[in-house]
Amino acid sequence: MMANDAKPDVKTVQVLRDTANRLRIHSIRATCASGSGQLTSCCSAAEVVSVLFFHTMKYKQTDPEHPDNDRFILSRGHAAPILYAAWVEVGDISESDLLNLRKLHSDLERHPTPRLPFVDVATGSLGQGLGTACGMAYTGKYLDKASYRVFCLMGDGESSEGSVWEAFAFASHYNLDNLVAVFDVNRLGQSGPAPLEHGADIYQNCCEAFGWNTYLVDGHDVEALCQAFWQASQVKNKPTAIVAKTFKGRGIPNIEDAENWHGKPVPKERADAIVKLIESQIQTNENLIPKSPVEDSPQISITDIKMTSPPAYKVGDKIATQKTYGLALAKLGRANERVIVLSGDTMNSTFSEIFRKEHPERFIECIIAEQNMVSVALGCATRGRTIAFAGAFAAFFTRAFDQLRMGAISQANINLIGSHCGVSTGEDGVSQMALEDLAMFRSIPNCTVFYPSDAISTEHAIYLAANTKGMCFIRTSQPETAVIYTPQENFEIGQAKVVRHGVNDKVTVIGAGVTLHEALEAADHLSQQGISVRVIDPFTIKPLDAATIISSAKATGGRVITVEDHYREGGIGEAVCAAVSREPDILVHQLAVSGVPQRGKTSELLDMFGISTRHIIAAVTLTLMK
């Protein structure tokens, strides 16, 4: 950077001040037009946004999604009007469009989403922006090895979220010197003062304790902000935090630093007078042109990834699907150099260590911080820069559900791998057993849910997920199970496999993972009694192959049994019931885990909770008696 970036001339300083006031005016008009909106939060951040967008950040005005642009994340998404106002000043949004804030069919929503080309991730659920910023910064520093920088504007109130400090620890550990977090310390939260109010020095101490380079500035002093952002650009091997002391509602008489104005526009009868007051402080009509970025990001391709060779397993081989996951990822990493894997300190249990051993430069250890791991994955995947797989015990994704939910709103392309599913986890104990994960991921919009049952189908699930738009979840299991498919078998999303069938099938049994193998064993026992059953492997639980299930049910007298290593609520059985709900004369009998499990051997627990071979045989017998 040039010296005048650190100390801009008098004219530039005045234009930045004037721009900040125009941002306030845009925010006032937009919130008045909508009748609601966090105007006061916009006003406290006006100088920060002015300096970032028109002095510090480098980006192409006409191409907001360019890979070399600096990134900006508004973690405090409720201040969206100030972001939209900035893009009015840039020239990408018209002033008339800004007046459609929060209206139906307008992309200018209450909180920003990637429906807008200048928004990388959806925000509004507080405490998540910095984690995604970490993912962007990590990608820029270690994968793209490019010049772009990442700026995250946060509110002081959201610093109460633990995920913020997970992100702080991550950024410090990985020396993300291309990352700048700005705390807008405006003293007030939604319903009252923030816990530390204007204790900016305490925020500074917290940031420094996490190993961040930190500056404490007057957030309404554009010269001080320019200086701080320039200094941040000179620091090596440390992320920077700028603690900006501001006032909520800055510039608005009787509202500045006053409580009970969060989420409220100024009264319409006062709006014109307030706008005129702010306009009277504007001395120029000039605009500053953003600097162009350094174009040094590599050209990449993350589409149409092919298997380099068929799966190397034979029918009858025994291997756990969660181990196959690690082997398949390492193989996928050879097919495309933009495949990355994130772990929450479980690589030796989930077998992602196999990928790490082969591709160490593309493995990201996120330690025991699952919320941040998901946020980092979201950030890494923005602008199509990586194919991200994040793995953990599936049970621990529950604590990151809000991040997953926001990832869906962000239209994120990330892949989550959940291991140690169900009571088949066995002696590792109940706290490690995922029994709610299918319900959780099935509820996420546009999320594809894979449940492979052997090594062949697991490898296919990995490749399909890598090529699938949107979020994907792959459920893997700990017990070793037999390979039942040949290497030549083809798999598709939404297409089930009928793995056992005959002309005289009496009942359709649907199982996945370990319970598919229990179902096949039950079918063998029943055939010795002269009872033929059809066995289906759904492969994907969402979308579910309703056509195959319905046709099989009709072929077996409308008799269907589902068996799953999951709670009844939200699992395979309920998915099947929904699929056949409009079909007359189809009866679904569900076998699922009920109650809180306990530690034990896999076979003991499958039997104790009614999902073993013995219970499937009993269910078939009972169904045929009705």
Curated annotation (Swiss-Prot):
Could you tell me which species this protein originates from? Homo sapiens
Q: How does it assemble?
A: Homodimer.
Matches recorded under InterPro entries: THDP-binding (IPR029061), Transketo_C/PFOR_II (IPR009014), Transketolase-like (IPR051424), Transketolase-like_Pyr-bd (IPR005475), Transketolase_C (IPR033248), Transketolase_N (IPR005474)
Q: How is the cofactor bound?
A: Binds 1 Mg(2+) ion per subunit. Can also utilize other divalent metal cations, such as Ca(2+), Mn(2+) and Co(2+). Binds 1 thiamine pyrophosphate per subunit.
Q: Where is this site: Important for catalytic activity?
A: 262
PANTHER family assigned to the protein according to its UniProt record, in alphabetical order? TRANSKETOLASE (PTHR43195), TRANSKETOLASE-LIKE PROTEIN 2 (PTHR43195:SF4)
Q: Which UniProt keywords apply?
A: Calcium, Magnesium, Metal-binding, Thiamine pyrophosphate, Transferase
Q: Which residues are the signal sequence here?
A: none
Q: What SUPFAM superfamilies does UniProt report for this protein, alphabetically?
A: Thiamin diphosphate-binding fold (THDP-binding) (SSF52518), TK C-terminal domain-like (SSF52922)
Please list the residues that bind Mg(2+). 156, 186, 188
Q: Which cofactor does it need?
A: Mg(2+); Ca(2+); Mn(2+); Co(2+)
State the function annotated in the UniProt record.
Answer: Plays an essential role in total transketolase activity and cell proliferation in cancer cells; after transfection with anti-TKTL1 siRNA, total transketolase activity dramatically decreases and proliferation was significantly inhibited in cancer cells. Plays a pivotal role in carcinogenesis.
Any one cellular-component term (Gene Ontology): cytoplasm
Molecular-function GO terms, alphabetical: metal ion binding; thiamine pyrophosphate binding; transketolase activity
- Reactions it catalyzes: D-sedoheptulose 7-phosphate + D-glyceraldehyde 3-phosphate = aldehydo-D-ribose 5-phosphate + D-xylulose 5-phosphate
* Protein name per Swiss-Prot or TrEMBL: Transketolase-like protein 2
* UniProt family annotation: Belongs to the transketolase family.
Q: Which residues form the active site?
A: 370 (proton donor)
Documented EC number(s): 2.2.1.1
